[in-house]
Curated annotation (Swiss-Prot):
UniProt KW keywords: Cell inner membrane, Cell membrane, Membrane, Sulfate transport, Transmembrane, Transmembrane helix, Transport
Name under which the protein is recorded: Sulfate transport system permease protein CysT
Disulfide pairings: none
Pfam families cross-referenced by the UniProt entry: BPD_transp_1
Native source species: Salmonella typhimurium (strain LT2 / SGSC1412 / ATCC 700720)
Domain ABC transmembrane type-1: 60-263
Length: 277
């Protein structure tokens, strides 16, 4: 009996596994271990004093509020942009699709400088919003704008492949059975999109938690008002207070990991429920 040799795209299992583990150790575990080593230099009382400092707590609140608003905005308009790019054909569609990746390619400092110019009192958007007594620069709203700009591609690029795979024929079939467009979207499209949409919003939120370059230009560094956690960490590093910087960072890291774990659990349960039906 002839032995059938299986062809693999990657080299041998041992080499592939070893390379993967090396990558995980160097890129993921090593930075985390450095963070833990810095935290080990602090007692629990010192750690608690740092993370519960009133100014640090205020930075947590501003960061979480702005990231939440930005992620909700991205969830709505990211879904809308993915829908337009997938369901419609129009002149300039390819250019618009390419522009969706601009926040990834644009340096965050350049993005922050551009947003600060547009939303300043004399800027194009700033002058318009001033008529409604809305100020964006040097407020938490400016932080949310910067976060939304830098993280909206996560939603668009997560939802877009699912929409392309789903196709419009499912909506058309629902409409031929008497469903309205809203009903077909809510009962046919949205259940299929929900896992990808939730994942995109979660990625947008976690990305926003660590935003620094764009935020500093549009919101500045006003104590108790526009300070974000990434800026607090930077200030502690400038003071060579590495344990305190690590303590502040550990709270955001824990929040991000908890969110990602919750989203993965929710997605798996949602997937099992859909398959069960």
């Amino acid at each position: 009996m002839l032995a059938v040799s299986s062809r693999r795209v990657l080299p041998g299992f041992t080499l592939s596994l070893g390379t993967s583990l090396l990558f995980v150790c160097l890129i993921l575990l090593l930075p985390l271990s450095a963070l833990v080593m810095q935290l080990s230099q602090m007692s629990w009382a010192q750690y608690w004093d740092v993370v519960t400092n009133p100014q640090v707590v205020a930075a947590y609140k501003v960061t979480l509020l702005a990231a939440f608003v930005a992620s909700i905005f991205n969830g709505v308009f990211g879904l809308l942009m993915a829908w337009i790019l997938t369901r419609y054909r129009f002149p300039g569609r390819t250019l618009l699709d390419a522009l969706m990746d601009l926040p990834f390619a644009l340096p965050t400092a350049v993005a922050g400088l551009t947003l600060a110019s547009l939303f300043s009192v004399n800027g194009f958007y700033g002058q318009f919003l001033a008529q409604f007594d809305i100020k964006v620069t040097y407020t938490w709203l400016g932080i949310a704008v910067a976060m939304a700009f830098t993280s909206i591609p996560f939603v668009v690029r997560t939802v877009q492949p699912v929409l392309e795979e789903l196709g419009p024929e499912y909506e058309e079939a629902a409409q031929t059975l008497g469903a309205t467009r809203l009903q077909s979207f809510r009962k046919v499209v949205l259940p299929e999109l929900s896992p990808a949409l939730i994942a995109g919003v979660a990625l947008s939120f976690t990305r926003s938690l660590g935003e620094f370059g764009a935020v500093i230009f549009i919101a500045g560094n006003i104590a108790w008002k526009t300070e974000v956690t990434s800026l607090m960490i930077f200030v502690r590093l400038q003071e060579f207070d590495y344990p305190a910087a690590s303590a502040i960072a550990s709270v955001i890291l824990a929040a991000s990991l908890l969110l990602l774990f919750s989203i993965n659990t929710l997605q798996s349960r949602f997937g099992r429920r859909v398959v069960g039906h």
